[in-house]
Amino acid sequence: VEWTNFERATIKDIFSKLEYDVVGPATLARCLVVYPWTQRYFGKFGNLYNAAAIAENAMVSKHGTTIIHGLDQAVKNMDDIKNTYAELSVLHCDKLHVDPDNFQLLAECLTIVLAAQLGKEFTGEVQAAFQKFMAVVVSSLGKQYH
């Protein structure tokens, strides 16, 4: 993947402004509410019966934050995201048996949460850079499935 200087700077800027403990839980909660079939991977998380229960679930919040912190590795290794996520891809494919389409659903939810957090700063150009970044992340996480 070729990254422009603007794209690199934009991705680093976005992650420098992220409130991980807000964005992570909101992203995973949104995914579990909007795409309820994704809940099947979180059976040990307890009460996921409705949007309020999901939003208040401490395990959802913790895992959402973990997911966003996991993206730090991609930010730090933008030139080698596929290898950066090789082990995580194997884990999600072979052990957890996560449908790889769910990575894209989560990326879409993150984009929405991020747009809400950044407001006017989330211009079309910023969105394009972010979505390119997330497309590479999603592809890398799904690499083991191919």
UniProtKB/Swiss-Prot annotation:
Entry keyword annotation includes Iron: yes
Organism phylogeny: Eukaryota, Metazoa, Chordata, Craniata, Vertebrata
Oligomer and partners: Hb2 is a heterotetramer of two alpha chains and two beta-2 chains.
Protein name: Hemoglobin subunit beta-2
Domain Globin, residue spans: 2-146
The UniProt record lists the keyword Iron: yes
Record PANTHER family: HEMOGLOBIN FAMILY MEMBER, HEMOGLOBIN SUBUNIT EPSILON
Transmembrane segments: none
